[in-house]
Amino acid sequence: MRLLVIDGNSIANRAFFGIKLLTTKDGRYTNAIYGFLNILLSLLKECEPDEVAVAFDLKAPTFRHKMYDGYKATRHGMPEELAQQMPVLKELLADLGYRTVTAEGWEADDILGTLAAACAARKDDCFLATGDRDSLQLVSDTTTVLLAATVMGRSKTVTMDVDAIQEKYGIQPRQLIEVKSLMGDASDNIPGVKGIGEKTALTLVQNFGTLEGVYEHIDDKLIKPKQREHLLECREMAQLSHTLGTIRTDAPIDTAEGTYAVGEGNKAEAVRLLQELEIHSLIPRFGLDGIAPAAPEEEDGIELAEAELEALPLTPSGTYLVASRPAVMGKQGTRNVVLQPESWYAVQDCTVYPLEDADLVRLLDNADVTLEVFNAAPLYAKAMAAGGWGSSIVWDGKLAAYLLDASASKYQISELTASYRAAAAFTCADYPDAGRLADLFCKMKAEITACGEDSLYNEIEFPLAQVLADMTRTGVLVDKDGIEQFGVKLRTELEQVLGRIHMETGSASFNPNSPKQLGEMLFDTMGLPHGKKTQRGWSTDAETLESLRDYPLVEDILQYRAYQKLNSTYVEGLLKVIGEDGRIHSTFNQTEARTGRLSSDNPNLQNIPIRTELGSQLRAYFIAKPGCVLVDADYSQIELRILAHITGDEHMQQAFLNGEDIHRSTAAKIYGIPQEEVTSRLRSSAKAINFGIMYGKGAYSLAKDIGVTVKEADAFLKNYLAAFPKVSGYMDKTIADAKACGYVSTLFGRRRALPELASSNFNVRSSGERMARNTPIQGTAADVIKLAMVRVWKRLRNEKMESRLILTVNDELIVEAPQTEAEKAAQILREEMEGCVQYAVPLSTDVHAGKNWLEAH
């Protein structure tokens, strides 16, 4: 028999501190639960146990506290974020069939010791999973400790058996008690002997065997005079430490074989709880997929009617709820295959209508129909492919879910119905979520209203989905031949840089793509500074190389990497996704970024490089079709203008209103000098501070950005905050308000939950403060450009123009316009982008036209 015993408090603690804070949409912490269950799955795979016990401490004092008042007196209490998760974790373990073990007056360590001793008596194998090295004293021929440790900055489970203990410490496992009695244990406040550390304690135990043996040989010349003095002075404390540090093996718990066999638990309740905690990924990993969650209390005992499955009427009318049943994947040999394809369905009253594409087309642009849907984007695509616009769609649940919880990694109906506890109106075996759609949509609409996000939803996010679908359908024309020729040029540059690298290293076989070879060359062979060791050798990440850019070899390495990325990601990447029409049809992602920003993929056009001359040339291959031009409108310093408006800082506002160079004006204000005396260096510093202040950068980060000492950067920051007190006041108030309510908002009401602000961990809390400073500004900028996109798109349609909005990248919009409409398109872009909001500082755009993106930008 193989028994796995988990030190519950220790592993939960490891999981909590090892994973960033995770919360549900209603603010419940889940990171410790998620991490613990992942560790449990790994342990089950590694040990293949027949039985599993999870030991937990109780809050009550133990016999050790009664023996010594100072025992664990220096320990901080459990963080509140972790304490909230512990009862839920125990409930979940019980539902999964795992038995938890506690004993009043005893510690989890003693439970581990007692179960290990029982296994040894039966000659059964016992595995102890813990992060506490105290348990190493329990290692024996039948007991192995699986020690959760951090090795070279990474979490790792280290297997400790008798041989491993002997190799690491040079003693037997039980002798570790003797070591602890001498050196003490600061974490448990076990005193030990003054002046005796681990190295000395190990030497003494290796030579004299036990604590008693040390005192029997107290006059041995191996023991130095000062050590002898301390040993004699602290003899009673050493004996006490021995008793405190010894894990007991007689805790009053059940140790009979079979006691900890994994039971049935309550799988339906486990599914319900995992869904409620929004830890959906673990449901299949625990073999729970296909198990219906326990019904909410209000549904318990209620008989629900089975829905009718019917074909869509030839002349549909009224309101339908439309959603899709996800595809079911499976294995065919080693290949992933689709066992059941995605399928759409509509719900009206208690009837479910399976939908073919032809049915969808009849619904999507039907004056007699209104559609409340989940995930409008693919439906708009289907409508537009059929020559329509999807005008029947009036609401999208996926967009609502995103606004209500932007931190979620995905949005699925089954998960949302669980987290919202949506009541079922009927049952439907073929479409399990269909009966809960109405209540889910109703609850989401109510929450959108309660959060004050109706305007954000109705004026920006919902209409934007149609705009993005049209942009994807239209696509961007590219010069395929030009991209191919650019690739040839790029590869030539790569070969030349590689040749220089080989000359500088003196090795034609040197591979700059090998982190190992590069690290050894830079730090072992050449002896360059700033080397950092990782588990795999020398670090050669971008930050390390940037700090060494002044060395010719490193400059060439950075150049080589940049050219490689250009070639693989953009040249080769773009060529792969050019459609038959010669256009790239990138997919715009509306529900991914927590700040509200858009992203794109297939390909990602948001990161087209512009900072290098060679990289910016790529824009030349995004072109207008014959007879047309690209009209590019780019917001000028939109985030700084929003900062000026949102903080109410008069100097910053006046600088913009006067048309001044904001960075030069800032430098003049900070240093108390006329603008004409501001040097380029001072302007650069002011620019870095202007943007850095929004991102919560401190003196250290700023120093790296502008190439000054940390002390100088700190002085810059202090001067800035003194010169712009309203900016400082706004930042402080934003953080305070966010801590009070748990979120920050943009000027349009978009919320971003920040559970990090409640963390007891300084680094996590500081990260939350940076996000609190930045999100209202960056998020408002995202909202503004989205609103501008909606207004530009609608106006182009309303004025029946051929011009089409085809692309957005960061703060710019691009329209492909016939030459005869170019001037009008530019006017519309400027008017709608600058006029979509009225702030204390007017928004400003730079608008240009050209045959290609580079020329237009």
Give residue ranges: language-model regions.
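Domain-level signal for Mg2+-assisted phosphodiester chemistry and nucleotide/NA-binding surfaces
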Residues: 1-99, 732, 746, 759
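Conserved beta-strand -> loop -> alpha-helix junction used to position metal-binding or nucleic-acid-contacting
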Residues: 5-10, 128-131, 135-163, 389-406, ...
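Extended two-metal-dependent nuclease catalytic cores across DNA- and RNA-processing enzymes
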Residues: 22-24, 73-253
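Conserved DEDDh/DEDDy metal-dependent 3′-5′ exonuclease domain
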Residues: 51, 105-107, 131, 303-305, ...
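Conserved "right-hand" nucleotidyltransferase catalytic core of DNA-directed polymerases
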Residues: 234-355, 436-610, 629, 639, ...
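Function-dense linear segments that define catalytic or interfacial modules
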Residues: 398-427, 434-436, 590-675
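Conserved catalytic core of nucleic-acid polymerases
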Residues: 473, 585-586, 590-593, 668-801, ...
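C-terminal polymerase-core module
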Residues: 492-499, 503, 507-554, 722-770, ...
